[in-house]
Amino acid sequence: MAATSEKQNTTKPPPSPSPLRNSKFCQPNMRILISGGAGFIGSHLVDKLMENEKNEVVVADNYFTGSKENLKKWIGHPRFELIRHDVTEPLLIEVDRIYHLACPASPIFYKYNPVKTIKTNVIGTLNMLGLAKRVGARILLTSTSEVYGDPLIHPQPESYWGNVNPIGVRSCYDEGKRVAETLMFDYHRQHGIEIRIARIFNTYGPRMNIDDGRVVSNFIAQALRGEALTVQKPGTQTRSFCYVSDMVDGLIRLMEGNDTGPINIGNPGEFTMVELAETVKELINPSIEIKMVENTPDDPRQRKPDISKAKEVLGWEPKVKLREGLPLMEEDFRLRLNVPRN
C-alpha cells in the first residue's frame, strides 16, 4: 500500500512529443497554438511570432471578444492557420507550444457573461492542458494581476497570495484565473507538463476593443468623440500601464526561458486615474472636461507590479513610456472611429 502511495506522488517526466513530429515527412518548424489569438494581445503576439520564418502559428478563437480583422494580414499565409474554436471544447491538433490567452479580460464582457468567463478559465485551461499532455507541448498561461485582488502589499510581488472577494461580481475572472494557475501547477507536478505562468498587468495599445470599458480605451474614445472623460470615484486609485509590444516581448521571453513562473509582466510606472485622464486630455483633446462618476464594486485601490523577478530571470523590462504609447493607440482609434485630425 505504501509503495502504491509513493508511486502516485512521484513527479513524472515530461511527456514526449508525438512521434509524427519527428518523422522525416515533418518540417522542423516550431508549431505554435495561440488560444484567443484574434484578440488584442493575442493578435500582436501572432505578428511577433510570424516574424520568425521557422514558426508556424495556429490561432483558435471563438470571436467572443476577438476579431478576424485583427489577423487579416496573415489569412492565407502558408505558415498561418485560423480555427474558429471555443476552448471549452477539446481541440485535437499537433503543436510544440501553446500560448493560452483565451478569456474575456474586460469587466464589461466578463460581467455580461460570468458563467462563460469561469468556464473558459477552468474548462478551457483543462482542455489546453490536456492537449499539452497528449502532444508533449510546453504551455504558457496568461494569468492576471487580478489574482492579487485589492492588494494589501504594494507593489505586488509574485509571492503575495492576494486579497480577493471569492463571490463578488469580478470573481468569475479573478478566481477563475487563480483556479487556472492551480490546474497548471497540478498538471506540472502530476504529469510533468512544461508550464509557464505570466501574471499580466494592465496592457494598452492598438486593436483594443473601443467600447470594452477598460480605462485607457474609454478615455481615448471619449477624447476623440469630444465627450467628457469619466473617472470613477475617488480618482486616486492607481494602475500601471504596459504597452502591448513590451507585453508580447515578455510573454515570448517567458515561454522560451527556463522558469515556470508565475512572473509579473507589467510596467511599474504608476498613475492615478485622474493623472491618466489629465494626460489623455493634454495629448488628445485639451478642450474636454473630466467628470467624476460612481465606481463599480471591488475596484482595487492600487495596482503596481514588482518586476524584480522578470528583470532577473527573463532580462525583461518595459521600454515604452505611457506618453509614447498613448499617441500610437490614438492613431489606431482615429482610423477605426473615423475621426480626422483637425
Curated annotation (Swiss-Prot):
User: What segments bear the compositional bias annotation Polar residues?
Assistant: 1-11
Q: Name one GO biological process term.
A: UDP-D-xylose biosynthetic process
The answer to whether the entry has keyword Membrane is: no
Show the catalytic activity: UDP-alpha-D-glucuronate + H(+) = UDP-alpha-D-xylose + CO2
Where are the catalytic residues?
A: Y173
Binding annotation for NAD(+): 61-86, 173-177, 214
Q: Which GO terms describe its cellular component?
A: cytoplasm
The annotated thermal profile of this protein reads:
Optimum temperature is 30 degrees Celsius.
Coiled-coil ranges per the record? none
Domain of life here? Eukaryota
Q: Which UniProt keywords apply?
A: Cytoplasm, Decarboxylase, Lyase, NAD
Localization annotation: Cytoplasm
User: Binding residues for substrate, per the UniProt record?
Assistant: 170, 202, 215-219, 232-239, 299-303
What are the protein's GO molecular function terms? NAD+ binding; UDP-glucuronate decarboxylase activity
* Pathway assigned in UniProt: Nucleotide-sugar biosynthesis; UDP-alpha-D-xylose biosynthesis; UDP-alpha-D-xylose from UDP-alpha-D-glucuronate: step 1/1
Residue numbers spanned by region Disordered = 1-22
Required co-factor(s) are: NAD(+)
* The keyword NAD appears for this protein: yes
Q: What is its EC number?
A: 4.1.1.35
What does the similarity note say?
A: Belongs to the NAD(P)-dependent epimerase/dehydratase family. UDP-glucuronic acid decarboxylase subfamily.
PANTHER family documented for this protein: UDP-GLUCURONIC ACID DECARBOXYLASE 3-RELATED, UDP-GLUCURONIC ACID DECARBOXYLASE-RELATED
- What the protein does? Catalyzes the NAD-dependent decarboxylation of UDP-glucuronic acid to UDP-xylose. Necessary for the biosynthesis of the core tetrasaccharide in glycosaminoglycan biosynthesis.
Q: What is this protein called?
A: UDP-glucuronic acid decarboxylase 3
Source organism: Arabidopsis thaliana
Q: Which gene encodes it?
A: UXS3
